[in-house]
Regions:
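C-terminal motif of bacterial Sec signal peptides marking the signal peptidase cleavage site
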Residues: 15-18
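Bacterial N-terminal signal peptides that target proteins for export
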Residues: 1-5
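Short Fe-S-cluster ligation motifs
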Residues: 97-109
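Sequence/structural segment immediately N-terminal to covalent heme-attachment motifs in c-type
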Residues: 53-78, 83, 106
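Electrostatic cytochrome c docking/interface patches
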Residues: 27-62, 149, 155
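Sec-dependent N-terminal signal peptides
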Residues: 6-12
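Bacterial signal peptide processing site
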Residues: 20-22
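Flexible coil segments in periplasmic/lumen-exposed cytochrome c-class electron-transfer proteins
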Residues: 24, 41-42, 64, 87, ...
């Protein structure tokens, strides 16, 4: 009986070896985008920090500590080996979809994360000023590839 269970488990797992999630279709993507834009909180909340190079620099500093492992140094996945191979794929923060969120929505995402996408929430880890500065930095991302590859992926 035990060998039968082991054989059944091996066959089942072997059958899953070639399985892979397919990318979402257009309808799924549009539905999810609609839902995200209508159900993510803080839609009308404004960034209280000044929109200036000092704030962007503070945001870049915080971003470089907390965000580069998944979003790359430039926020556009440059050098992140797994970015397009997980489901859902990690978005480029310069994409029209991400940039269409309000500042308040981006702050809400940073605070709460997006389950089950792998985007963690930072509430309690980062201060409000750090989070708002990251939002400001996201509005002024450098060109793709201009910041190099995160150190963790170069060795």
């Amino acid at each position: 009986m035990r060998s039968l269970l082991v054989a059944a488990a091996a066959i089942s797992l072997g059958g899953l070896a070639g399985c892979k999630a397919s990318p979402p279709g257009k309808l799924e993507t549009k539905t999810l985008t609609f839902a995200k834009h209508h159900f993510i909180g803080n839609k009308k909340t404004k960034n209280p920090l000044p929109d200036n190079p000092d704030t962007w620099a503070d945001g870049k500093e915080a971003f470089s500590h907390y965000c580069v492992a998944c979003h790359g140094m430039d926020g556009q996945k440059t050098g992140v080996p797994f970015a397009d191979h997980i489901s859902p794929p990690i978005p480029s923060l310069a994409s029209a979809d991400v940039q269409s969120f309000t500042d308040g929505q981006l702050k809400w995402i940073l605070d709460n994360g997006i389950w089950p996408s792998g985007m963690p929430g930072s509430k309690g880890t980062l201060s409000d000023d750090e989070l708002w500065s990251i939002v400001a930095y996201m509005r002024h991302l450098p060109p793709a590839g201009s910041q190099g590859i995160p150190d963790m992926y170069t060795h």
